[in-house]
Amino acid sequence: KDISHVVENFKICAGDAQGDFDGTVFGDGDFYKWMESAIYTAYQTDNQLLKEEIENYIDLIGRAQQPDGYLSTKQIIGERSGNGVSRMGDINDFEVYNFGHMFTAACVHKRITGKDSFLAIAARTADYLEHLYEEAERTGEVQTAVCPSHYMGLVEMYRTTGEERYLKLAKQAIALRDSVKNGLDDNQDKIPLKQHEKILGHAVRANYLYAGVADLCLEEEDPDYIKVLHKVWRSLVDKKLYITGGCGALYNGASPYGYFFDHQLVHQAYGYEYQLPNITAYNETCASLGGVFWAYRMFQLEPKAEYFDILERMMLNTNLAALSLDGKRFFYENMLRRAK
């Protein structure tokens, strides 16, 4: 049963079903992450039924995609119904986040199977992004995507295809952050990226950002970016990380770095240095997953045991403990002590 309605959303986009969009705006990305995991599992265990299911889903994704490469089920269904939903109209619709996880899943599929079917879909979406960034540079109208998985996804596209344009696109996407007007601490775009010194704002967004920057540096070294990565990593590990590897003490709060008379809301976020309460800890599971991505890439940049120590702390405590043994239930947040 499609409890999340994710597959049904793709079927509606592909014309296989009728109905309205339902579920979370990041559901497409969750589906792509499931696809990535399923691909690994199917070919490690030689599960023929799962292999067939994967190929059927790739066909569905391809038929849901628009001619220009765009693919976000909420927007496609909304455009057809005329309910006022528009492409790239709200960064909190997670469109580019979803793209990034599609890129990664498609690369895994190509590497394991040798097939181009999923990668061709991802390439068309990357073409759409390329046109989007060209337009942003031309008009100066730039907004930063939340939880920017596409940085890592585009670097993976480069590694998988060898096409330099994907690395260039990842570099362009990261550089465009500095052109955002009225940026926010919560989205890590209030000041230029190369001025970052402290971990702040939404914890998932932050960890995905620095994981993506580290991925870029693995392919094209940038001393300024590497310096930022080391400074912000120390800010996290020395002053804002829970003993369990939990990331982001606050559910809602005010940015500790906001200007007077410019108090900014932060959500699911890092707080003040050493602000690590037990009962009210938020510690979103997704943030620790982002931390694993980041720590792994820091280790590749600089093979020190500390990075894998932190990776294991996050993965074997917060991440592993957040999932039930039967795989059907999970914790979205991970406090250290529950109060009755």
Where are the regions a protein language model picked out?
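Glycan-recognition and catalytic cores of secretory/periplasmic carbohydrate-active enzymes
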Residues: 1-340
